Amino acid sequence: MIKRKAYWKDLIQSFSGSKGRFLSILTLMMLGSLALVGLKVTSPNMEATANAYFTTAKTLDLAVMSNYGLDQADQKELEQIEGAEVEFGYLTDVTMNNGQDAIRLYSKSERISTFQLREGRLPQSDKEIALASHLQSQYSVGQEISFKEKEGSHPSLKDHTFTITGFVDSAEILSQRDMGYAGSGSGTLTAYGVILPSQFDQKVYNIARLKYQDLAGLNSFSVAYEEKSKQHQEELEQVLSDNGKERLQVLKKEGQESLDKGKETLDKAETNLQEGQRRLTAAQARLQAQESQLALLPQAQREQANAQLTQAKQELGKEEDKLKQAEQSLAQEKEKLAKHQQVLDDLPDPKYQVYNRQTMPGGQGYLMYSNASASIRAVGNIFPVVLYAVAAM
């Protein structure tokens, strides 16, 4: 009993003798606990917020793109993938008024990766566009905006001036600062917009978006989602592994048919040119024969015949000039045909690329968000160790 009283007495004296240290430790523990709670709930809250947005926007799980687009055979194959919904679309990189700021124009999607409206409305007619929400301070609804395509490239758009109908957020581009690379302007993407699919002047789609049923209920930042998504990506890459060679055969066949028709046209033109040259040579021979007989004619007839010969020579000279121009044009067309044939012969296999949310063009924001959430979670896990180590000092 006496020992217990002595123990409590010593304990009380130790606290009363170092109140400052005791209060410091107590305050540190309280602040640390609050910080720990904040760290522990921040990462789940971030992920919950992002998952809610992905659900609302129906964000894709995987995307397929090809440098030659996706033809009917590709579309049919992708539509047959079990457990996945697929939607095809267009996109192209152009520049804004200053010719340097690159903007990516997407076709309006209906079921996957839909655009979330922030002001105004989505485009409903041709020559209408909804821009990225971070451009609200620079443009207004009802204003017109024009774009330029890369010089020397095949036009991707039917129109280049649009009326702004609203402002949107993308389901795929989460960052407003780091949007990745662009194929136009300065090479850095600065904005995006959405227009109707009918505004694209393209024969084939250039993106397929896929959404899988077994990924719908998973946390997009979880290990389970990443593993299943990776499995689907590998399966999809396997499905598309032979599409490049098959597509190349189709492209070469179509290209060769077109070149053969062009060659046939040039052959006919060359035959006509040779016939024209033959007639010209015959006409020149007749003129020379007539000219040699002028001296045999009486004076009056000789003057009249000489005038006729002079006029005939002029007409013949014009025909000769036309033939020379035709020969030059034919030679140029033959050279073009030979170059096209060489390009067709050297045509590489089309490349098919499968992207996930992080790796697809413009997906840097998703990657940054995922890394930030993981970093906060890691700090929350190690923070208690640091806190108690400091308290023990």
PLM features: what roles do these ranges have?
Residues 3-392:
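Membrane transport/envelope proteins' first extracytoplasmic loop
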